[in-house]
């Protein structure tokens, strides 16, 4: 029997491709995203992938910061499907810039969307999973949740927070048969980075190093996994009964997490800064 999978942030990118793969495999998708047009077109695609099964997927436009809306969505999903098997928290925004120059209100928004957004969707569905005695809570983290990169201090902080929150959560929910996991990609060839890569202003002491970082990042993205390639790994993790707690999507993430585990910090930093052309 297919799973009922809740996905946030599925209008494009990895979330969209994962939803299509899961639906094609016989799973039922419920999810939301702020992009109403993207959600509508995905609904049509998903319904076309499983017409013979009679399954209906449930997608709605919704802001991750709309807490009452999330609870209504939860109630509608449970009324429609009677259970939920997996929740994938995939909503997130990036944040780039020298720490000295960042807008703290914008930083607060990033932290609220990335961290409290994940907490909100997990908290909404956790009681149902506890009552049914099973379920998986999966959070989209990042390589920078363990290995911070320069000019990504706030984004790194949000992913470090997700990792700590989910680590603690897994101890609390394990007695109820609920599994918890993290997915930690480094780079995927989407427009995610391009949307946030803004050079510091003329005269900034950080401008030249930030320029080199952006140029190198743009170069690396050209050979990064596609959203579909990343989604195949995500779908694989969702379909595992007992997924590993830490899960990587690409070589870069696996490589730097290996360095982080076994090398002295000074040597790891030297390799990282050389890799990003800002040594």
Predicted segments, located by residue:
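The beta1-alpha1 cofactor-binding region of Rossmann-like NAD(H)/NADP(H)-dependent oxidoreductases
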Residues: 61-72, 104
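Residue(s) in the substrate-gating loop at a strand-loop-helix junction
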Residues: 142
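Conserved glycine-rich Rossmann-like NAD(P)H-binding loop of the short-chain dehydrogenase/reductase
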Residues: 27-41
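Active-site helix of classical SDR
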Residues: 122, 158
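Substrate-binding pocket helix/loop in short-chain dehydrogenase/reductase
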Residues: 98-99, 106-108
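Conserved glycine-rich cofactor-binding loop
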Residues: 11-12
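SDR active-site lid
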Residues: 175-244
């Amino acid at each position: 029997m297919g799973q009922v999978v809740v996905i946030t942030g599925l209008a494009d990118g990895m979330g969209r491709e994962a939803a299509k793969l899961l639906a094609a495999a016989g799973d039922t998708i419920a999810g939301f995203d702020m992009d109403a047009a993207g959600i509508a077109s995905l609904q049509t695609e998903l319904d076309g992938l499983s017409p013979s099964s009679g399954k209906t997927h449930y997608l709605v436009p919704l802001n991750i910061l709309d807490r009452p809306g999330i609870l209504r969505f939860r109630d509608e999903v449970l009324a429609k499907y009677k259970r939920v098997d997996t929740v994938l928290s995939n909503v997130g925004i990036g944040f780039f810039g020298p720490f000295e120059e960042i807008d703290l209100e914008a930083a607060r928004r990033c932290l609220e969307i990335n961290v409290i957004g994940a907490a909100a969707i997990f908290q909404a569905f956790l009681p149902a999973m506890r009552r049914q005695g099973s379920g998986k809570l999966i959070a989209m983290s990042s390589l920078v949740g363990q290995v911070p990169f320069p000019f990504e201090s706030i984004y790194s902080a949000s992913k470090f927070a997700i990792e700590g929150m989910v680590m603690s959560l897994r101890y609390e929910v394990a007695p109820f048969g609920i599994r918890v996991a993290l997915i930690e990609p480094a780079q995927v060839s989407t427009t995610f980075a391009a949307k946030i890569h803004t050079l510091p202003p003329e005269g900034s002491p950080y401008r030249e190093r930030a320029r080199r970082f952006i140029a190198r990042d743009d170069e690396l993205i050209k050979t990064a996994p596609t959203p579909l390639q990343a989604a195949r790994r995500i779908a694989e993790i969702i379909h595992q009964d007992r997924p590993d707690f830490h899960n990587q999507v690409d070589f870069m993430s696996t490589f730097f997490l290996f360095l982080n585990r076994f090398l002295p910090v000074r040597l790891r930093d030297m390799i990282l800064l050389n890799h990003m052309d800002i040594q």
